[in-house]
A protein has these predicted regions:
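Sec-dependent N-terminal signal peptides of Gram-positive bacterial secreted proteins and lipoproteins
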Residues: 1-11
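Active-site-adjacent loops and short helices of periplasmic peptidoglycan-processing enzymes
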Residues: 11-159
Length: 161
């Protein structure tokens, strides 16, 4: 998982002194040019959904036409009381894969993220989270662990620069 942003020399952004953690690395040499709290474990926020979407797309391998996912009780009701974003999926509803992807990407839908995690996780959200953490291990991300596919905060849900 690699996120990159290119800025022109004159680009203006938030002052690094007001940022909780950052790391600037020379892409050619791997040399850390500047950092602050780069190994501090912080809430991953939407990086969680990037992993969720990436694993769903990896499993589908671009073949999502005609793929329908069935919404489980847990997809919907595990979010009760979280006041999280959703696309109002209903238990038992069959959702086209493409709609689940778009809903999760565009609306940041946590019910959509749960549905996708079940898809790539062998039928359970827990299996999806296990797949996310297996990918973390494969990528060698020492300071990253996911507790859910949705980005809801938790003590065991963190990443670093």
């Amino acid at each position: 998982l690699l996120l990159c942003t290119a800025l022109s020399a004159g680009a203006v952004g938030p002052a690094l002194t007001t940022t909780e953690a950052y790391c600037i690395i020379d892409a050619d040499t791997g040399l850390v040019l500047a950092q602050q709290n780069m190994n501090e474990e912080l809430h991953p926020a939407l990086i969680t959904k990037v992993m969720t979407l990436g694993l769903a797309c990896q499993k589908a391998q671009g073949n999502w036409d005609g793929v329908k996912l069935t919404v489980s009780h847990e997809d919907v009701y595990s979010l009760a009381g979280t006041d999280s974003s959703h696309i109002a999926l209903r238990e038992g509803e069959e959702v086209p894969m493409q709609d689940a992807l778009y809903g999760t990407m565009i609306a940041s839908a946590n019910d959509g993220a749960n549905l996708l995690a079940e898809y790539y996780g062998g039928g359970t959200i827990e299996g999806g989270v296990a797949a996310m953490n297996a990918q973390v291990q494969a990528l060698g991300l020492e300071h990253t662990h996911f507790a859910n596919p949705t980005d809801i905060s938790g003590d065991d849900h963190y990443t670093s620069c």
